[in-house]
Amino acid sequence: MSLRRTAARAFWRFSRWKLVTERVPRDRAGILIGAPHTSNWDFVLMLAIAGEADLRFKWLGKHSLFKRPFGGLMRALGGIPVDRRDPAGLVDELTARIAEGDGFYLVVTPEGTRSGSGWKSGFYRIARAADLPVTLGYVDRTTMTTGLGPTIRLTGDIPADMDVVRSFYADKAGFAPSRRTEPRLREEVPVQDAGTPDPS
C-alpha cells in the first residue's frame, strides 16, 4: 500500500468528517477541484479524499515548501513545486506531461484563501488544453461531509461551464463558511470591469 493511501486511511479512521463520494476511474488522468477553499484544512481533506480513492494524484505547492528538510516528503506525497512568477509556463509543462502519457489527477484549489476575488483559471486552461475531465471535490462544514462530486467535461463556453460548477457548489460551505467566495472566473467578467488579467 502506498504512503499516500496509508496516510489517508489513518486520517479517515480518526476524522470527524464523513466521506461521501462518487467513484472516479483510477486509471485515468483528470483535474480534481478542491472547493470551497477557505482554509488550508480544505486542501488536507482533498489529499485525504484522493488518497482513500487510491488515485495517482499530484498537487501544486509553493516552491519554498520543497526545500530541505521536507522537500523529499512533499514530492513523495505528490507535490509539484510551483514558481508563481511563471504561471503560463506551468500550464504548458503540465499539459505536455499529460500529453506524453504521464497520467495523474491534479488536485487544484482555484479559489485562493486570501484573495476573495473569485477563482483562478489555470485549472480550466489545463483541462481544455489536455482534454481532461474535471471532478468537483467539495468540503461542507455545515453537514461535516466531504468527497468527490460529479465529473464534467468543459466545453469552452466559460459562462455555461461555470454555471454547472456554481450549481454544484451552491450549498457547499467549505471549512470556514464566512470566507467562501462565488465560483467565478475573471474571464466571465466584462472587459471594462475585469481590471488587470490574472495570469494564473
Where are these regions (language model features)?
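Conserved protein kinase catalytic domain
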Residues: 12, 47-50, 74, 149, ...
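Short hydrophobic helices that act as membrane-entry/anchoring signals
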Residues: 1, 5-16, 71, 75
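Short alpha-helix boundary/capping motifs
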Residues: 1-2, 39-40, 64, 116-117
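N-terminal signal-anchor transmembrane helix
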Residues: 10-28
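Non-catalytic C-terminal accessory region of glycerolipid acyltransferases
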Residues: 3, 7, 14, 87-200
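Catalytic core of membrane glycerolipid acyltransferases/transacylases, capturing the structured
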Residues: 23-85, 141
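A generic structural signal for alpha->beta connector loops
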Residues: 16, 54-56, 76, 103, ...
